[in-house]
């Protein structure tokens, strides 16, 4: 009667051993999940555009943005300035672009919405270790994002005030460059050229008068070889456009 009991004990022991082995395998394996339930982590709320997302998604993060605004329409369509923005992080670039459009809207300056310019890529190859080995190299890519805002029908003083306000409240890491167009009346270049020609003629006439006065003085005072040398110096000075006072100083130093 002892044999059935022994068989039942052996069968029970054989049934328990695989479970123990399974538990040992589960405890030693790092790829199997534990039996405790896990709650799903909240998904980060990122904007629809992939360019404006942060490089590292964080749970529950709130992106700083401004309310949408419609720029003032141009009254005459005269292009007076263009603001170029560029940065390596598109989120900061979009924030500064929105800030520029809002500030121009507050100053009643007609502008366009920020235009997306072509993205610039730069590839850099550096050593992966401090040792000079050809195989131990690493490549890095740097992207530069760019935006452009056009300004219309605004006074120069208003544009200077707007640019100064943007410079005072600039965001680190975002570069700004403005191209300002000045409109003048027709014939402005001709007037500038005429004024320049008049100044040159006055200077040339004065130089000739000084050279003639020095020549007359040398002819009246000098004799022989000294007279010829004095005349030659005055002629050379006139050719080199040297004033009479400078010529006198050189003569005093030589004597």
From Swiss-Prot:
Example GO biological process: translation
Q: Name one Pfam family in it.
A: Ribosomal_S10
Q: Molecular function terms in GO for this entry?
A: structural constituent of ribosome
What task does this protein carry out? Answer: Involved in mitochondrial genome encoded proteins translation. Involved in the binding of tRNA to the ribosomes.
- The protein's predominant localisation is mitochondrion
Please name the Gene3D superfamilies in this protein's record. Answer: Ribosomal protein S10 domain (3.30.70.600)
The residue span given for the transit peptide is: 1-32
Q: Where is the composition biased (Basic and acidic residues)?
A: 236-255
Under what name is this protein listed?
A: Small ribosomal subunit protein uS10m
Compartments where found? Mitochondrion
Does the keyword field hold Isomerase?
Answer: no
What do the Gene Ontology cellular component annotations say? mitochondrion; ribonucleoprotein complex; ribosome
Q: Which family does it belong to?
A: Belongs to the universal ribosomal protein uS10 family.
User: Sorted alphabetically, which keywords does the UniProt record give?
Assistant: Mitochondrion, Ribonucleoprotein, Ribosomal protein, Transit peptide
Q: Does the keyword Cell wall biogenesis/degradation apply?
A: no
> Quick one: where's region Disordered?
30-52, 220-255
């Amino acid at each position: 009667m002892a044999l059935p009991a022994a068989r039942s004990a052996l069968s029970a022991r054989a049934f328990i051993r695989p479970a123990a082995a399974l538990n040992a395998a589960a405890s030693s394996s790092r790829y199997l999940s534990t039996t405790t339930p896990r709650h799903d982590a909240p998904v980060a709320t990122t904007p629809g555009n992939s360019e404006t997302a942060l490089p590292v998604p964080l749970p529950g993060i709130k992106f700083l943005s401004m309310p949408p605004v419609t720029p003032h329409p141009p009254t005459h369509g005269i292009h007076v300035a263009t603001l170029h923005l560029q940065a390596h992080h598109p989120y900061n670039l979009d924030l500064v672009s929105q800030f520029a459009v809002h500030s121009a809207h507050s100053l009643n300056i007609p502008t366009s919405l920020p235009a997306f310019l072509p993205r610039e890529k730069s590839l850099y190859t550096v050593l992966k270790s401090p040792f000079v080995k050809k195989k131990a190299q690493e490549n890095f890519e740097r992207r530069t994002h760019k935006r452009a805002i056009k300004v219309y029908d605004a006074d120069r003083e208003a544009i200077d005030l707007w640019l100064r306000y943007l410079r005072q409240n600039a965001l680190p890491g975002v570069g700004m460059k403005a191209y300002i167009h000045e409109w003048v009346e027709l014939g402005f270049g001709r007037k500038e050229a005429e004024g320049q020609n008049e100044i040159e003629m006055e200077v040339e006439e004065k130089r000739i008068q000084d050279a003639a006065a020095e020549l007359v003085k040398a002819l009246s005072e000098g004799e022989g070889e000294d007279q010829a040398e004095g005349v030659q110096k005055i002629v050379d000075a006139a050719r080199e456009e040297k004033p009479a006072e400078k010529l006198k100083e050189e003569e005093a130093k030589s004597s």
